[in-house]
Amino acid sequence: MSAPPQVLPPRQRILLTAHDLFYRDGVRATGIDRIISESGVAKVTFYRHFPSKNELIEAFLAYRHEQWLSWFSQSLAQYVEQFGDILPALVPCLEEWFSDPHYRGCAFINTAVELADMLPESLDIARRHKQQMAEEIARYLPLGPEREQRAEMLAMLIDGAIVKVQIEQQPQNALLLLREMLNSLAKVWGDQ
């Protein structure tokens, strides 16, 4: 990876470098010295902005949350408008992400698995991220007592597809299975 442009402020260069490395290589596998080297900052500058690796990890997750949720909201809105319903919109929305050559699963699932014992805060951050993803999904579901539960069901299906694509290293099978499950849900929910 090339270092971020030097025109960016040091904190942003550090964060963007950490984002790319943490997402691609994992949080534990990425050392501070590598981030310092690839972001083109001095060690003193790094520690002025991020006194600990844990603080950088939390900043990475906050940044990733903002970026991913913004993309998800926009993409989902586009496909819901195109298809008129959330269920058929989810597959093409996720296909966009899964087809990205840099796809490496969900940064929140990955980080929670890597750091649950070492950084329990990562679990709280992951839970908040997943809750906000479910809330975004709920926006497109009919009002009613089942709305929240249905949003959670869809979020769980999405998480399963995310992990399946990450393990299989290709999205076609996961997207096919997700489409079948969503079609089944549409029939069940339509009968109620």
Across the structure, where does each feature detected by a protein language model lie?
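Secondary-structure edge/capping motif, primarily at the C-terminal ends of alpha-helices
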Residues: 79, 115, 165-169
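Hydrophobic alpha-helical connector segments
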Residues: 59, 73-100, 151-154
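N-terminal intrinsically disordered/low-complexity leader segments
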Residues: 1-9, 190-192
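Amphipathic alpha-helical packing segments from all-alpha helical-bundle domains
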Residues: 66-69, 75, 85-88, 117-142, ...
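Alpha-helical DNA-contacting segments of helix-turn-helix folds
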Residues: 57-64, 71
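Helix-turn-helix
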Residues: 13, 17, 21-55, 59
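Amphipathic alpha-helical segments used for helix-helix packing
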Residues: 98-124
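Hydrophobic/aromatic-rich alpha-helical bundle segments in the mid-to-C-terminal region
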Residues: 121-128, 143-192
